């Protein structure tokens, strides 16, 4: 893909004060408080920390509750593809592999989109992180906001700071966004293959060792 580097976000709603940073936004959920979860707003803040000049597309696939469906995610991803997103951040994981989501991921990957998703540090595989071509990211307490670790695929491909931009919230979902943000920052200046770029940027290699 060529042209302007645009980042797509699949998440919950975004508060009005941050909506001005969005190139376009579309809701794929029914009525409800558009940003009551706060998660989508936290994701936007992380992206602005890493790549403040990068255009952002926002597909709201979560409503008032922390729930979505493979059909909603697939519809949002298809829209982001049609709107020209090059990098897509998916800071969530669904328990089950579903054909509709698998096919949407395959179409996006085939179109040259860079797909980043969160993955748990322990436990069963989740989706879309479990699909081929998706960069899987888990939280790594060793990493600051601008640092990543190369984990070699188990439990994830990369680790990153598990905190939001304010340091108040934590989880693998924010780690994925830090990686997507670093990709957006650096791919504005280079045509390097995404995984090769992340390997080069990695400060740590191998899994985080936690003492009992």
Segments the model singles out, each with a brief description of its role:
Residues 57, 114-116:
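Structural detector of well-ordered beta-strand residues that form the stable sheet scaffold
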């Amino acid at each position: 893909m060529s042209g302007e580097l645009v980042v797509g976000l699949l998440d919950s709603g975004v508060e009005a004060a941050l909506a001005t940073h969005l190139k376009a936004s579309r809701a794929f959920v029914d009525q409800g408080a558009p940003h009551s979860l706060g998660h989508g707003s936290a994701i936007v803040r992380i992206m602005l920390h890493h790549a403040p000049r990068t255009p952002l597309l926002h597909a709201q696939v979560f409503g008032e509750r922390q729930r979505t469906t493979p059909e909603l995610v697939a519809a949002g991803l298809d829209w982001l593809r049609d709107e020209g997103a090059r990098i897509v951040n998916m800071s969530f994981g669904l328990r089950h592999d579903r054909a509709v989501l698998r096919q949407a991921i395959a179409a996006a990957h085939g179109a040259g989109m860079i797909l980043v998703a969160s993955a748990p540090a322990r436990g069963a595989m989740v989706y879309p992180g479990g699909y081929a071509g998706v960069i899987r990211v888990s939280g790594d307490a060793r990493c600051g906001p601008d640092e990543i670790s190369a984990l070699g695929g188990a439990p994830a491909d990369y680790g990153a700071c598990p905190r939001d931009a304010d340091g108040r919230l934590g989880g693998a979902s924010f780690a994925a966004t830090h990686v997507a943000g670093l990709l957006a920052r650096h791919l504005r200046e280079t045509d390097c293959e995404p995984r090769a770029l992340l390997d080069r940027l990695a400060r740590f290699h191998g899994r985080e060792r936690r003492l009992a």
